[in-house]
Amino acid sequence: MPTIQQLVRSERRKINKKTKSPALKSCPQRRGVCTRVYTTTPKKPNSALRKVARVRLTSGFEVTAYIPGVGHNIQEHSVVLIRGGRIKDLPGVRYHVVRGTLDAAGVKDRRKSRSKYGTKKPKS
């Protein structure tokens, strides 16, 4: 505990919280251009081919973003919207592509949790 005299001399320092998504620069989403679209494998207990894209953002950062859902139409030079949110079993992947905006189409034939995958209400 500091004494009152020590507090008079210099005030308490604020603890600075480190952001988990620095490339967004305090914005909810950021636009970017895909420089590479590829698949990668997850960490140890899991096994799959996860779809990811390397994206150059308008903030100047180049980040790796996960493409959620079954099937996608994203290719090199596609313009996509990126939001925060990491993928626990992919090291270094801290962002998600927002489906159903810009060049990223929504997931086809999706019935449940449609808003998360940019899918319109099915006729019927």
Curated annotation (Swiss-Prot):
InterPro entries registered for this protein in UniProt: NA-bd_OB-fold, Ribosomal_uS12, Ribosomal_uS12_bac
Pfam family, one: Ribosom_S12_S23
Gene3D superfamilies on file: Nucleic acid-binding proteins
GO biological process: translation
UniProt feature, compositional bias: Basic residues: 11-20, 109-124
Keyword Plastid belongs to the record: yes
One cellular component term from this protein's GO annotations in UniProt: chloroplast
Keyword terms: Chloroplast, Plastid, Ribonucleoprotein, Ribosomal protein, RNA-binding, rRNA-binding
Stretches the record annotates as Disordered: 1-28, 104-124
Location of this chain's protein in the cell: Plastid, Chloroplast
PROSITE patterns: RIBOSOMAL_S12
GO MF annotations, alphabetized: rRNA binding; structural constituent of ribosome
Family classification: Belongs to the universal ribosomal protein uS12 family.
Primary role: With S4 and S5 plays an important role in translational accuracy. Located at the interface of the 30S and 50S subunits.
Oligomer status and interactors: Part of the 30S ribosomal subunit.
Protein name: Small ribosomal subunit protein uS12c
Native source organism of the sequence: Porphyra purpurea
